[in-house]
């Protein structure tokens, strides 16, 4: 609450938390010229990767590409510190292909700290933020009912554990797992945001006083083992296959160090039996905690209970850095007591003599259900207060980084008296994620997935720059150098597409005979190079093989050209669907409509629509509890009502 204490320092924007969301938020604000401060509990753990030291994966890599296309940092650092890179879903379509990098966690954190320390307009402070300075609007001071969503005041700054006050015009909260954090190993627990680091006190209570609803979520991390005690020669080796691919669109960031291998082992009957015998000792199955954990990153005991018919589960052994023997045991997080964890690890082939350096643990923490936020990530109750990352109920460095960029951008725009930027779900995975967060009543940690987007063929990683870099340039997030690089790339793509649509292969050409000899498919008459590229199992590299190119072009240009041509029909169809949806969202809904009379709506949708009385289908789509099926039902209802009006009008004319 507002205090009479004088401020130690004043800033335009304060970011609370130095994780992946906080770093992106602070950098974005500072690069837009705002006097920005980043407050963190531990300067030595900036942008730490407390769980898997990896960036990317399905849908997550698309997020990283999008953040980079908007001038963010996560993609550049992932490229710089990558130990291994692989393309996932390589044999599938471009909508679901993903780049994943195993990163050097210490190097990643070190490089991020260097960037923060050398960014103009940005200051870093080590302190525990325990309170918020808020000035209430008149007659709003006692309005603390979460159901009432109108603003009750505006942010004035923050207060630290030792009583210092720092004023700001906007505050971004990115507290990760530190609010009320408690780590669990078996039935034993201690207050901590993560292993070896204290939890944050006071801020949850402060948010509750301001009328925010909070809840608890859980996540976990597996044990770390000593690489030198693993029989790696007995295990399947997983090599890098994408050292020439990058998250960033900036060629200055295209650096690849020596690649390191990962290894694969599997659980055994002994593994499963040991877990079954001791399930009652884990925090969840023992009933010590009941917070929901991430569905798509389950503990090993969850896997064995959920998939009881499976005899074995794949486990990956991944390096944590070039200068450490620690190996991350991916897919093997557990809540078992520490004295059983080593026994469990030693049931895995290759790990019979392993040494456990750090035990696995679960962490339980407070979060704010994101339905209390606008799509700009500003809270609905307090003007100028923003929230990003795990505090909003998400899981993952990539999700956090994307939210941090959005929150930092909009906090800066608020200070500059500019309208907030909303990322639409049809324009980006950033928009898809935020739309899901602020409109759906989520009860478990949210992870971005390709299946969450209706427009995933358009929202690919390779075209994130085409979708978002013009916006980034317009907003001041992309500098002139990057803008020139972007335009040069687009020009190359367009020129090559035009060439392929014009130039033809004739049946009598030497290249046509070579194609028939190599593929068994003849060229009949003549064929444009674009139509040749549209053939199944033909790729741009085949144009090079058959001497059908006129110049050497970069790999990212080749990829853009191939996808644009090969999937042109699908892409046009999806663009048409998006345009149709935009038109539909503008359709107005009648005032004081009795939604209870529309039987095709779900019960929850009727309740929410009756209370809210949205002006249009677009507004209805933003309400929590209103599904896509409900929107379709409303659209059908509007069409039927329109037809009824036409019939009534016709009947009146006939009568007259």
Curated annotation (Swiss-Prot):
InterPro entries cross-referenced by the UniProt entry: FAD/NAD-bd_sf, GIDA_C_N, MnmG, MnmG-rel, MnmG-rel_CS, MnmG_C, MnmG_C_subdom, MnmG_C_subdom_sf
Entry GO CC: cytoplasm
Gene Ontology molecular function terms on file: flavin adenine dinucleotide binding
Main localization of the protein described in the UniProt heading: cytoplasm
Alphabetical GO biological process terms: tRNA methylation; tRNA wobble uridine modification
Positions bound to NAD(+): 293-307
Subcellular compartments: Cytoplasm
Keywords attached to this entry: Cytoplasm, FAD, Flavoprotein, NAD, tRNA processing
Cofactor(s) annotated in UniProt: FAD
Gene3D superfamilies xref list: FAD/NAD(P)-binding domain, GidA associated domain, C-terminal subdomain, tRNA uridine 5-carboxymethylaminomethyl modification enzyme MnmG/GidA
Transmembrane segments: none
Residues binding FAD: 17-22, 129, 200, 390
Subunit annotation: Homodimer. Heterotetramer of two MnmE and two MnmG subunits.
Chain's role: NAD-binding protein involved in the addition of a carboxymethylaminomethyl (cmnm) group at the wobble position (U34) of certain tRNAs, forming tRNA-cmnm(5)s(2)U34.
Similarity comment text for this entry: Belongs to the MnmG family.
Protein name (record): tRNA uridine 5-carboxymethylaminomethyl modification enzyme MnmG
Encoding gene (name): mnmG
